[in-house]
Amino acid sequence: MALFEKINLEKGMYHLTGKSFTEALEALDPSSQYADTPLAKLDAYERQLKRFDIRISGKNCDRVEKFFTSTESAVLFPEFIRRSIRQGIDSSVLSDISAAETKCSSSQYLGCELDDSVSYDIVTDQSAELPKTEISEQTAPLILKKYARAIHISYEAIRRQRLDVLSVMLKSVGMKLGNAVVKAAVAVLKSEAGSSTAIAG
């Protein structure tokens, strides 16, 4: 029996400090040990789907109720929802206008300012002082806003729904959330407070 088939899945794995559910699974079942095997392209979560024979796409896609055939397989359902919504967010243009991504545990973010107001067209002599570009910490933090959506789903209404159909609906929610974040990001890019941070990446 492979290691991924021996893991005891618990709801508490979603609440470990500083770890996502997939990271908690990876700690118990590292993907590195599956190199050069048929499972090499799967992450720890996808291996659990394989363990419980849950197919989330394709011709033989399962229905929602397949997640709830056991208490352990049911633990995988919230991550299915999260991944579907995340795919929707990633399909927005947010990544196209972001030079870097920083995870922040507080409600404020203190970035960097880039001052390169001196022209780059200046030709310098051998002994002359070089034009300067200054990078410094911002004096005023950016107040981070939270975007979320409560999704109410009746189990009786969707238990027989195909997982790929549910995923499409969740991706739609994610895309709209992503577009809302894009709108806010563009506003920050245009503002005096966010311009230097945005330029610095």
Labelled PLM ranges:
Residues 1-70:
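Intrinsically disordered, low-complexity terminal tails
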Residues 23, 47, 66, 79, ...:
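Charged/polar, solvent-exposed surface patches and flexible loops
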Residues 15-19, 108-110, 146-153:
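Short, exposed beta-strand "edge-strand" segments with a Pro/Gly-rich flavor and a Y/T-containing core
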Residues 21-26, 30-36, 132-133, 140, ...:
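Short alpha-helical interface patches
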Residues 149-201:
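Alpha-helical scaffold segments that mediate packing/assembly in large oligomeric complexes
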Residues 61-147:
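Assembly/oligomerization interface modules of large self-assembling protein complexes
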Residues 2-5, 38-44, 113, 128-139, ...:
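Phosphate-binding glycine-rich loops and adjacent basic patches that engage nucleotide phosphates
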